[in-house]
């Protein structure tokens, strides 16, 4: 089942560039920075807003959900994209704006794959809500499996 044939996730694993390296240069995608707050403070993470850096936790601006929808409108007008993701700069689930954005995106662009990343701490609380909003893919960052190491981080 190498190609995920028969899987209910086959469409996503074939089309989403995070799960299929062959799609990296073929699938247009947009990441929108609508989630500035985080629910943990990791020693290695410095959230920042600037135009100079390109790394996790840094963005050139924070978008309000309506601005993010306008951005997706603009990007889809320029060329085809199939994926829109919320990836910070904080934790997606620690921000009500994430849910507002996905609700609006579902109404304006229902065919796009909706994805997000999270540290997962709030996932049990919000998993049903994400499903109701049509979020197709959730990436959970795992920084440690040993609780002692996690405390150091």
Can you say where each PLM-predicted feature lies in the sequence?
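Conserved Radical SAM active-site core
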Residues: 47-140, 144-151
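Canonical Radical SAM [4Fe-4S] cluster-binding loop centered on the CxxxCxxC motif
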Residues: 4-9, 18-63
């Amino acid at each position: 089942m190498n190609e995920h044939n028969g899987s209910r996730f086959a469409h996503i694993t074939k089309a989403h560039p995070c799960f299929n390296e062959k799609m990296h240069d073929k699938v247009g995608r947009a990441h929108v920075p609508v989630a500035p707050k985080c629910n943990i403070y990791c020693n290695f993470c410095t959230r920042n807003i600037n135009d100079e850096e390109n790394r996790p936790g840094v963005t050139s601006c924070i978008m309000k959900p309506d601005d993010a929808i306008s951005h997706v409108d603009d990007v889809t007008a320029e060329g085809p994209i199939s994926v829109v993701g919320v990836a910070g700069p904080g934790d997606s689930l620690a921000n009500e704006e994430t849910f507002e954005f996905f609700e609006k995106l579902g109404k304006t662009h229902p065919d796009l794959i909706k994805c997000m990343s999270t540290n997962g701490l709030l996932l049990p609380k919000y998993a049903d809500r994400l499903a109701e909003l049509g979020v197709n893919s959730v990436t959970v960052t795992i920084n440690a499996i040993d609780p002692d190491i996690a405390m150091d981080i």
